[in-house]
Design a protein with these regions (language model features):
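Conserved phosphate- and dinucleotide-binding cores of soluble alpha/beta proteins
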Residues: 1-94
């Protein structure tokens, strides 16, 4: 079903966000659906709390270079490893 949609913006949560693995989740079904929507959208927004930064879950949703925005409550030191030219990091809760 997800492959029929071409959203301008896809907003998803992740169990882990890591420079090498990108955005990841623990469930195969969750990953399959999120990966399909993420791949079909013009921009991808990933939400991940500070405890999920640097963590790698079992299944990849998207590579870091394919994420447009990361919304997190992580500190500057926690997000330093994730910064890139393509990724805009939005810090909340400070």
């Amino acid at each position: 079903i997800a492959r029929r949609y071409r959203p301008d913006l896809c907003v998803i949560s992740a169990h882990g966000v890591n420079r090498v693995a990108g955005a990841t989740v623990e469930s195969f079904e969750d990953a399959s659906i999120k990966r399909e929507f993420a791949g079909n959208s013009a921009e991808l927004v990933v939400m991940a709390g500070r405890e999920k930064l640097g963590f790698v879950a079992t299944y990849q949703i998207a590579e870091l270079d394919n994420i447009s925005y990361l919304i997190t409550d992580g500190s500057s030191s926690e997000i330093a490893d994730l910064e890139s030219d393509r990724l805009t990091i939005i810090k909340v809760g400070e």
